[in-house]
């Protein structure tokens, strides 16, 4: 189907930006970086970043300018899943067919990996190659959507 082509391309773009943006597992602190990569790479449907690309394509936006917000949204999603899988939340053992971060590593590393993914998402947006006004709008939007008025608030209601 012709509509699948852009979705596959966009998913590959996000995977490539994640691969480039995340520190290698060999970079200190190795365990933390390995956990971050475990949480984000090689799995998932990438629905949220695909929505970013799809919305941008409606306005004719060059895909290169959408890489940062699409990848930041995926990092926030990964961070939320890492924290949601913790024993204090849902205590899930598997995510995307592999052990969750707290099972594959440990709880402390999972918490730090989630926190680091959240910080990395904001850093990626802050350094995006767009004008300052747009960067601030993206940062404000991501903070609102992931904070107490959004995802964190919803999780608080869930627990």
Language-model features, listed with the residues they occupy:
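Mg2+-dependent prenyl diphosphate-binding active-site environment of isoprenoid biosynthetic enzymes
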Residues: 6, 22-159
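N-terminal amphipathic/basic leader segments beginning at the initiator methionine
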Residues: 1-23
